[in-house]
């Protein structure tokens, strides 16, 4: 399912852009300096300061759930480093965002926030952020999204057998689970000392939670190495097919509010919290859609055929059919759609939006047996003949599609997190924040303080 652009961009823009009431509080800034060197790129101190302010603005009224400023700064800086690394890798893979695409994206963001692009610019200026910086943030987010999509297309697959198994599990349990997690990361091929350090740290975090000194979300913000740490480790609602098999059986036996772990996973040690449960089948009902059976003839536009030539050709073809020529025979002879020409242009049964909105509108407007006027799509010039229509229950089909998507999303999350660890491990990263504990650290992500012997937080956080 495609999310609204404002939602898709939210995670990164929360870090890299402002639109924050705190931003305007800093009216004057010292001369900018480098906060981190990331291979051949840099993170500027102004970027880091802006990102930290935005995280704090999201926790307004819940400040006691945030870690100390030095820890928060490290977490945010590490996330900015990962963004830089992904953008660099995307550039190496030829992933680009044109100015036109960027303009459309920003216009969409403005519209979904109830304003115009000019209004958005004014809001950004009032909050202390330059429009050029905002454009760069949006461009980076689109690039990261495309890198992730490219990764999914090349490395993630879901078999029909996996879908069948997941559907059987869903039928057996009928439940969905709202989960949160804390990850104490381990590098790939971790040695015994690194594993022991990770085990000590995760045991310390679990002890803090068990004693009530930190609630789970606050502990996630403070200690988790997961990309969603600053969201309290919230994983949202998951069905069992979205949960790694090693954890699925544990979750079945848990009650809301319980915390399981430490558990060893591919990326390190994890603590898993079951926040709440719900019936996945509640409100289930048939979903009926109109499907159409149609044939079409396509004349393409290209180097060997101009727009005018293609239009003249499709007009001639339609005139022949209206004059009595058989549509299927004419399609076999004249259509330039190689996928359907051999079947006389037959497209089978399909929902109206299957071939794009323009094609769908033409099919919907026809009566059975009628032939459309020539119309243009990105593919070229068409005529279409509607053969029939029917009402179809697509509940089972939709359910399979949803399950396939959730399995793919879970696989992508696991694999992409490992991919990010690889990127980070291969990179030259040097922090220049002025903190001796962090500066000049290279090729290994910054970690939060070891909680094995933690000092108590300033105040007990609330949920």
Curated annotation (Swiss-Prot):
- Quickly give the catalysed reaction: [protein]-peptidylproline (omega=180) = [protein]-peptidylproline (omega=0)
- Domain PpiC, by residue range, is 174-276, 289-388
The species is Xanthomonas axonopodis pv. citri (strain 306)
Would the keyword Nucleotide-binding be found if you checked this record's keyword annotation? no
Per UniProt, the keywords (alphabetical) are: Chaperone, Isomerase, Periplasm, Repeat, Rotamase, Signal
**Superkingdom, taxonomy of origin:** Bacteria
Q: Where along the chain is composition biased (Low complexity)?
A: 441-450
Please report the name of this protein according to its UniProt entry. Answer: Chaperone SurA
Quick one: where is this thing mainly located? periplasm
- A single Pfam family, by name? Rotamase_3
Example of a GO MF term? peptidyl-prolyl cis-trans isomerase activity
The task this protein performs is described as: Chaperone involved in the correct folding and assembly of outer membrane proteins. Recognizes specific patterns of aromatic residues and the orientation of their side chains, which are found more frequently in integral outer membrane proteins. May act in both early periplasmic and late outer membrane-associated steps of protein maturation.
